Each structure stands twice: as C-alpha cells, then as structure tokens.
Curated annotation (Swiss-Prot):
GO biological process: phenylalanyl-tRNA aminoacylation
Listed name of the protein: Phenylalanine--tRNA ligase beta subunit
Species per Swiss-Prot/TrEMBL record: Halorubrum lacusprofundi (strain ATCC 49239 / DSM 5036 / JCM 8891 / ACAM 34)
Record's catalysed reaction(s): tRNA(Phe) + L-phenylalanine + ATP = L-phenylalanyl-tRNA(Phe) + AMP + diphosphate + H(+)
PANTHER family reported in the protein's UniProt record: PHENYLALANINE--TRNA LIGASE BETA SUBUNIT (PTHR10947:SF0), PHENYLALANYL-TRNA SYNTHETASE BETA CHAIN AND LEUCINE-RICH REPEAT-CONTAINING PROTEIN 47 (PTHR10947)
Length: 578
C-alpha cells in the first residue's frame, strides 16, 4: 500500500485550517481512507492509503480532498489552461518499446523547500504505482528557463524533440554528476542509471528528449543537470514518456493539478507524431495536452441505497457527490439515475461501485448504523470451497507449489503466445469475456484457461533452480450464449512440471494421483492441441466426460516464453471431481 509523507504545516496552509491540530487531521484523513502509520525523523506524518486514489500521493492532493470534506470546495474543479506555446515533436526514430509522450508547461509556480519536496515525492510515488516502476510511465520535470526550444519554421512556437539515439553516440551531464556521459555510460556508472538500466537494455536506440542545445532528458532513467529544478525555478516543463498514452496523460493531469493548487498556471503543449512514428491509435497523431476533459459515469438510486443501507432523497445524493469533488444530475424515471461528472485527476472511477463508495465517504461511514441481516440460517463453507481446498492439499502433497494468479489477462498472453486461436474448439480457446474500458493493455479480458498463467510464472523464474512444479485451482471464464449471463464461469485445476526430464508421463502420473484421491475414473485418449506437441497430447476424460487437456508444451510456446527446459502441463474443470 502506498505511504505518503505529509507536512502538516503545509497541509494547514493549503486547506486554510490554520488552527487544526495534527490529531484532528489524523481523524479527518482516516474518514477519507488514509490511515496514520507513524512519523519520519523530520516530523512528517506518514499515511497509508488505498492505491486507487493516486491523486492523494502529494500534500496538495490530500489538501484538496480535505477541502471537499470540510465543505470549503464543492463539485468538479478544472483548472484553466493557456493555449500552447511549445510543441513536442515525436521523431520516427523513437523506439517502439517506449513510443508515447505527453507534457505540460507550468508558469508562475512558487517552489519553496516544502513544495519542491512534495513535487519530488509525487513524481516518485507515481513512478512506483501508476508508472509501474517507470516501465509504463515516467515523469521528467525541468526548469523551463534552461530549455531552449528551436522553432520548426519561422514564426512557429518553440519545440523540443522526442527521438531515439545511439547508446554511445551522444553525451550529456546527468543529474548528480559533473562529467558528460553517454547513455550507456550512465547505465554502467551512475547510481540511478544502474537502478533503471533494465528498462532500456537491449534496445537498439535509447529514448531521448532534445532541445536546441542538445539532449536534456534520458527517459525513463534520468534528467540532465542543465535543466535541474530548484527553489528558484518559476516556470517548469513537464514531460512524460511511456508505453501507454492514457496512463501518461493521467499521470500528467495529477501533476498539473498538484501544481495548480500552488497557484501555478497550466499551459498546454502540442504533441505531433511524425509519419513513421507510433502514434496512439485512439487519439491520432496530433494531440494537445494536458487534456482536462471530464468523464461521465452513471449509477442508479436503488443501487446506492441498497449497498449503503440508507434511504436517501435524490438531493442528498447530489450533495454527497459534490462534497466528493464530483458533479451530478438525475432523471426522475421509473428508477432515479444519476449522471456523474468525474474530474480528470480521478483515475480510480471505473465502475458504478466507485461512485457508491464516494457517496458513502461523503455521507460518512461512521454515520451508517450496523444491523444484523434478517437471515434465519447458520453460515457454512460452500461445498465447492471445501473441494477446492481438498484439491489444493492433494496437489501440494504431490510436490506442486500452490499459486494464486490474476484472473485478468490479455489476448496476447491467453492466445497468441500460447499458439492458440480465439474462438477455436481447443481447450482454452473459447471466446473471451472482454473489458469494455480496460485500465491497462495487460488486462483486457478474463482468462479462458489457467495454463498460460503458469507458463508466464515459469517465464519470470528462469533464474531460479529446477525442478519447478507449480499448480493452481483458479477461476476461468468464456462467453457462452447458453448461459443466462452469456458467460460460463468455472473453476479450473491446472498443473505444470518444468524440469530437464519433464514429460507427458510425469504430468499424467500427477493427474492420475489427483483423480485417485477423489475416486474419479481417468481416461486420456489422444487428441490435438496447438499449445502442445502432436503425439504427446491427450484429452482429460473424467467419469466419461471430456473436461480438460494434458500434454507436453509445444517448443514454439517454450521459445516464446524463453524457457530452456521442457514443460508438461494439464488442466481440467474442478467440478469433474465432485
């Protein structure tokens, strides 16, 4: 869980609550979901919070939430932006592994030591969370006075360039250094370069940002010393690069909102992707950023009342939304429905339940009255839950390591890297349940089978000793028009054996032992499956019903996952053991 350091003197200044004590702040923030963790040596208060509210990674974001909580602010706030005076030109030489860029110009910012520390903390916390350790998105913040833009043509606005460079063909002075280094030398000799070297290693060209004077940023590794931000900086240039345009745009919004809270003016920049550059398909080749357009979600009145257990008037719910920093209107049809406007720094509102949570926090969870449900039964474990544990115990007894993998995946992992085609008749090849608005390209659908999850885990553990025998009892789903929900949800049992002598017989022996434990009759007639080797693949038939597949993983799949040892695997439906 993310932990943010808060200077309460800064918090008092940003909220206007100069008489509020530290203890009162702790209590108020607990009501917002931030739990006090302790104090630093510098007497800063540390708060832990759920990682969904990334806008609270700075004292400015926490202060904004408190101002809404106190009723000092209401509804959606969108900072005014000035028209672009700077352009970011994206060259076709940018490496495909990090193709996207965004940015903003900040003017009139007043950075004392506290504000600068907060900005650096926000930058690093966003790197660690939304930026996935800078792999998905990285932020560079520069003193604009030290950036010299070169107009592309006479009379045009100044521009900088995002391009790919030869790792040994250019040099610059990085932060915390005095001598010029090439990008490769930064990775080898600089402490920060060594920390993030794995993000660019293996690339033919490294990402770099240039102005008229030369390279001043080597994302996602380090900035140049020339544009270092200090307490004397009054105008800033913020640039973000990454693998997903949506992610870096939202990270940029959070940074801009934090600086706006300090009285800064936000100026947009133009982002132009050149012919041959990888432009974001959903936005086009010419962007204006930051984009402060609001989003909209809807939620029904009945859903809010049912989940919170409180009878509300529509006006009360609108009031709660406004005190949560949202705007809402409603329609009086058979069921009252609220159309809710969401500000651009709220990256956590993905589902109507997130809106219900906002209403609950604005109303005050302390004000909810607990009551026992009117149920005349005694609770107990479901039969399937007991079966799952029994199967896990059996697998562990056979030498498997029990796993719990993500149920979300992508088409690339579920199908492409497994040599499987979506919609095929092969086990695991069913049509997937896809996410309408995926938060990440890595999680766009529910998995249709579990073996890809096991193979991915083996891929991440090639540095560990063999044998590696892993298994999972987990969830899988696929589209099925015969179901009332159009989705068939099942629990699957999967196991994989990775070792020098892994074979069909080794996997079959483990599978037979599991079936024997549950007195199930196992048959394994020969079959074909694109993820497995022909002639070394069989269907799993339990008590006369085809419920899975077993075999030696195809060499093409092993190569795709950089596995240098054979792998044999099996998977079947859990309910077959009932």
């Amino acid at each position: 869980m993310p932990v943010v350091d808060i200077d309460t003197d800064e918090l008092r200044g940003l909220t206007g609550r100069t008489d509020t004590s530290d203890e009162e702040f702790k209590e108020d923030l607990f009501g917002l979901g931030l739990e006090f963790e302790g104090e630093t040596d510098e007497d800063l208060l540390q708060f832990e919070f759920a990682p969904d509210r990334l806008d609270r990674l700075s004292v400015e974001g926490v202060a904004r939430s408190l101002r809404y909580h106190y009723g000092d602010d209401r509804g959606v706030y969108v900072p005014e932006t000035n028209d672009p005076e700077w352009t970011i030109e994206v060259d076709e030489s940018v490496p495909d592994e990090r193709p996207y860029v965004t940015g903003a110009v900040i003017r009139g910012v007043d950075l004392d030591e506290g504000a600068l520390d907060s900005l650096i903390q926000l930058q690093e916390k966003l790197h660690a969370t939304m930026g996935r350790g800078r792999a998905k998105g990285a932020i560079g913040i520069h003193d604009l006075a030290m950036v010299k833009g070169a107009p592309l043509q006479e009379g045009s606005e100044p521009s900088i360039t995002y391009r790919g460079v030869d790792p040994d063909g250019v040099s610059f002075v990085p932060l915390d250094a005095n001598d010029e280094l090439t990008p490769n030398e930064v990775l080898a000799e600089h402490d920060t370069g060594q920390t993030y070297a794995d993000l660019v290693e293996g690339l033919d060209r490294y990402p770099a940002i240039y102005d008229e004077l030369g390279l001043f940023s080597f994302p996602p590794v380090i900035n140049g010393k020339r544009t270092e931000v200090t307490t004397g900086s009054r105008e800033l240039f913020v640039e973000l690069t990454g693998t997903d345009q949506w992610t870096i745009d939202r990270m940029c919004n959070i940074v801009c909102y934090a600086l706006s809270a300090r009285g800064a003016t936000i100026e947009q920049v133009e982002v132009n992707y050149a012919d041959g550059a990888t432009a974001p398909s959903e936005y086009g080749a010419e962007l204006v950023r930051p984009n402060f357009d609001t989003d909209e979600k809807s939620v029904s009145h009945d859903r809010i009342e049912t989940l919170l257990g409180v009878d509300f008037e529509p006006e009360e719910i609108v009031d709660c939304f406004e005190r949560a920093g949202l705007d809402a209107s409603y329609t009086l049809d058979e069921d009252v429905t609220y159309e809710v406007e969401i500000p651009p720094y709220r990256v956590d509102v993905l589902h109507p339940l997130d809106l219900v949570d906002d209403v609950g926090r604005a109303y005050g969870f302390d004000n909810l009255e607990p009551r026992y449900p009117d149920v005349g039964t005694v609770g107990g474990r479901h039969e399937r839950s007991r079966l799952e544990d029994a199967v896990r115990t059996s697998l562990v007894g056979l030498g498997f390591e029990d796993l719990l993998n993500f149920h979300m995946t992508s088409g690339t992992e579920n199908y492409d890297r497994m040599n499987l085609e979506a919609g095929s008749d092969a086990f695991g090849g069913g049509n997937p349940v896809e996410i309408t608005e995926p938060y990440s390209e890595e999680y766009t659908q529910l998995r249709t089978w579990a073996i890809p999850s096991l193979v991915m885990l083996l891929e991440r553990n090639t540095h560990n000793a063999y044998p590696q025998d892993v298994a999972e009892v987990g969830f899988a789903a696929e589209r099925d028009d015969s179901e009332n929900t159009n989705v068939a949800e099942r629990r699957h049992v999967a196991g994989a054996v990775a070792r020098r002598d892994a074979s069909y017989e080794a996997a079959k022996g483990r599978l037979q032992a599991v079936c024997d434990d549950f007195r199930a009759e196992l048959e394994t007639p020969r079959t074909e499956h694109p993820s497995f080797i022909d002639g070394r693949t069989a269907a799993v038939v339990i008590d006369g019903e085809v419920v899975g597949v077993i075999g030696e993983v195809h060499p093409a799949v092993l190569v795709e996952h950089d596995l240098e040892v054979p792998v044999a695997a099996f998977e079947f439906h859990l309910d077959a053991l009932r």
